[in-house]
UniProtKB/Swiss-Prot annotation:
Family matches, as Gene3D superfamilies: 3.40.50.11270, 4-hydroxy-3-methylbut-2-enyl diphosphate reductase, catalytic domain
Pathway info: Isoprenoid biosynthesis; dimethylallyl diphosphate biosynthesis; dimethylallyl diphosphate from (2E)-4-hydroxy-3-methylbutenyl diphosphate: step 1/1; Isoprenoid biosynthesis; isopentenyl diphosphate biosynthesis via DXP pathway; isopentenyl diphosphate from 1-deoxy-D-xylulose 5-phosphate: step 6/6
Name of the protein in question: 4-hydroxy-3-methylbut-2-enyl diphosphate reductase
Enzyme Commission designation: 1.17.7.4
Species, as recorded: Bacillus licheniformis (strain ATCC 14580 / DSM 13 / JCM 2505 / CCUG 7422 / NBRC 12200 / NCIMB 9375 / NCTC 10341 / NRRL NRS-1264 / Gibson 46)
Keywords assigned by UniProt, alphabetized: 4Fe-4S, Iron, Iron-sulfur, Isoprene biosynthesis, Metal-binding, Oxidoreductase
Residues given in the record as [4Fe-4S] cluster binding sites: C12, C103, C198
InterPro entries given in the database record: LytB/IspH (IPR003451)
Binding site for dimethylallyl diphosphate: H43, H81, H131, S226, N228, S271
The keyword Iron-sulfur appears for this protein: yes
Length: 314
């Protein structure tokens, strides 16, 4: 089968940095145990499973505060999505060692919110409700940050502040953000704009919007909790006009999706391990509609291949 390997795809620098930070923590014998990650370090189950094998445990829950309530000792790692100042303070009050793996692009948004609050602004924040990145951002200044996910949410806003700025979750689709920002401008004509689509997210979305046009089908390799992976599938369908499916790994690929397909495009979310994507590409490249011997789907990437290699400190 013809395979278009969409480029760029896969890991971004923020994800790699977060994984290296966590891997170094696993190797650092001076850190108090146990070591916990507050939520998924990045939104990919293969990564969290691999870290558990390294002795780093992922804790889950509806929000970071409730997750932190599960921890009474040891070390906590804040994920790439960032956390609120309240979470940091509680971790400190509990006497926990805290390691920060927040993506620098997320930190920029937190800094912006602090600056805007100091200058008397209210902030409209476009993001996905229930996602940890907006949770952390809103938590920076909950009294002046208003979370919206849809144009309908914008219509329900009732903000009387004279100074208003709109920003967004870094992994949103730039097209989604544009439409919601236009709605904000319609309701609040004097609003200021500060779009925060991270460059890695933007170039991956743009690559899909152009390169997927040449395919009959797009396969996005990414975890169901990965917002940027889900957005890539959305971009393929809504912008490139190409049907898309998101899969966690090769085991989730359905052969019936390939019926009548001559060319398939493959991309991956920013938190998807490269070996997982390569396995999908290899299968599709050898797949032949006429040869049943090429139809067997078998996911075989071992956990020790998932994490970046880091040298132990001497």
């Amino acid at each position: 089968m013809n395979v278009i390997k969409i480029s760029p795809r896969g890991y971004c620098y923020g994800v790699v940095d977060a994984m290296v930070i966590a891997k170094n923590a696993a190797l650092d014998k001076s850190l108090p145990r146990p070591i916990y990650i507050l939520g998924m370090i990045v939104h990919n189950k293969h990564v969290t499973d691999a870290f558990e094998k390294e002795g780093i445990y992922t804790l889950d829950g509806p929000n970071r505060l409730e997750i932190l309530n599960q921890v009474d000792k040891g070390t906590v790692i804040f994920t790439a999505h960032g956390v609120s100042p309240e979470v940091r303070k509680i971790a400190e009050d509990k006497g926990l060692v805290a390691i920060d793996a927040t993506c620098p692009d997320v930190t920029k948004t937190h800094d912006l919110i602090r600056k805007m609050k100091a200058e008397g602004y209210h902030v409209i924040y476009i993001g996905k409700k229930g996602h940890p990145e907006p949770e952390g951002a809103v938590g920076v200044a909950p009294d002046i940050v208003h979370l919206v996910e849809t144009e309908e949410d914008v219509e329900r806003l009732d903000i009387e502040a004279e100074k208003l700025i709109v920003t967004n979750q870094t992994t949103m689709s730039q097209w989604d953000v544009h439409d919601i920002m236009e709605k904000v401008k319609e309701k609040y004509p004097d609003v200021e704009f500060h779009q925060e689509i991270c460059l890695a997210t933007q170039v991956r979305q743009e690559a899909v919007s152009e390169q997927a046009k040449k395919a009959d089908l797009t396969i996005v390799v990414g975890d169901p909790k990965s917002n940027n992976s889900n957005r890539l599938a959305q971009v393929s369908e809504e912008i490139a006009g190409t049907k898309a499916y998101r899969i966690g790994d090769l085991s989730e690929l359905k052969l019936e999706w390939l019926d009548g397909v001559e060319t398939v495009a493959v991309t991956a979310g920013a938190s998807t391990p490269t070996p997982i994507t390569k396995e999908v590409i290899r299968f599709l490249e050898q797949f032949d509609h006429e040869d049943p011997s090429t139809w067997k789907i078998s996911h075989e990437v071992p956990l020790h291949k998932i994490l970046p290699k880091v040298k132990a400190k001497t």
